Amino acid sequence: MTEVVVVIGAGSIGQAIARRVSAGKHVLLADLRQENADAAAEVLSNAGFEVNTAIVDVSARESVHALVEIAIGLGDVIGVIHAAGVSPSQASPETILSVDLYGTALVLEEFGNVIAAGGAGVVIASQSGHRLGALTAEQDVALAMTPTDELLALPMLQPDQVTDPLHAYQLSKRGNALRVMAEAVRWGKRGARVNTISPGIVITPLAKDELTGPRGEGYRRMIELCPAGRAGTPDEVGTVGALLMGPYGGFITGSDFLMDGGVTAAYRFGELAPKPTTAAQATA
């Protein structure tokens, strides 16, 4: 039976992981825009991979389910790489929650119903999920366990509670990691694993939008002051993705792999840490 690797989001990171885990397998490359899928498929095809393309809107259940049907029609789904999403500079809070949070929950649910024994999935989250302050235990459980079609109705996600695109993005990415942790239990019953990767600033078209957007100065400061002193590359994320999806990652599931060049470390213990603004705060 043919083994199928599904790549959702035809960008640089999804391609980088796919190149490392898809040799001898059939790649189903899906994107919201056919031209993006076709361009990525040409690159992979020219590198010797067998590729089909599809259009998917991850914020629509019927679209994600249709992609599942295409995938199982090609063979056994042995891998799922979910790298689709929108950033704070690209969309409204409502769209970010719909695509990045709800869409990820849909992908995990729908592909968790068909993933083959021995299979593995990777969801691309973000360092931003680690920048969000602590949620309550009840909020953690709600993001992890609320039935998918009820997720966006949570009180904590309503427009009067989430008014800023960055807040929506941070909530979504924290939710991705929590959702994957919960889904790992269900995937495990099928003999499969699933994890998240939380990259920092990785040079992709999406990152370039952020670097030239309203928060660009802050992102450039992160690059300058993080321990690594540079941005990351899609190939570096691809290497971690290959570990998590391959045999050497066989004991890793329900986990989140933060790879941000030390930005989060610098925010907590280094030069990026928020500075007290008054003498009282400094001695508190």
Language-model features, listed with the residues they occupy:
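Canonical Rossmann dinucleotide-binding motif of NAD(H)/NADP(H)-dependent dehydrogenases/reductases
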Residues: M1-L28
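Rossmann-fold cofactor-recognition segment
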Residues: L44-E62
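Catalytic loop of short-chain dehydrogenase/reductase
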Residues: S87-Q90, A117-R190, I201-T204
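C-terminal helical subdomain
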Residues: L106, Q161, A168-Y169, R174-A177, ...
